[in-house]
Amino acid sequence: LTCLPQVLDTVGPQHVILLGHSDGASISAIYAGSIEDHRLWGVILIAPHFFTEPFGLAAIAKARTDFEQADLRDRLGKYHQHVDNCFRGWNDSWLHPDFREWNVSDCLDYIRVPVLAIQGHDDQYGSMAQINEVTDRCYAPVDMLALTDCRHAPYLDQPQATLDGVSDFCRRLADINV
């Protein structure tokens, strides 16, 4: 809750729609539910995590095996200068025994801006229960976009549907806030 406000203050936007994917979606939701920021018009949560699920942890354990024994390290290396630090920071955190009880769902109770929650039905790291948690707990209006034939990266598996959903949501927020 200290870094994101500093980034926003430095960049200096007057109006913000936070968009986060995976752990970034969790960060966006935590911010929206914890900080009263009048610049915030809405939040877009793509494949968010609010609690751990056994099958998701199993997929993260499989990712560790793929990183150590298959080609995942090479594939990620195209996107990350320090691929080992990046992967281990994520993977080791999620697989730490203390993390099994991790739950940040309470932040959803305090979100007071519109939310778009996007989830793939075939997400290997999180089930539809993640965005159902959003619709069940958020006080603010929530749009849900549940995509078939879609895993953890809707913008890759269903790019047009994801872009259309995000564009429509942003357009509607602009219309009501201008």
Predicted regions and their residues:
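Conserved acidic catalytic loop of the alpha/beta-hydrolase fold
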Residues: L1-V16
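Conserved hydrolase catalytic core segment
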Residues: Q14-E53
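Active-site nucleophile elbow and catalytic-triad environment of alpha/beta-hydrolase enzymes
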Residues: W90-C107
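Short beta-strand/loop motif that positions the catalytic acidic residue
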Residues: I111, A117-Q119
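Acidic catalytic loop of the alpha/beta-hydrolase fold
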Residues: D122-G126
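Catalytic active-site module of serine/aspartate enzymes centered on a nucleophile-bearing elbow/loop
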Residues: V142-D143, T148-V178
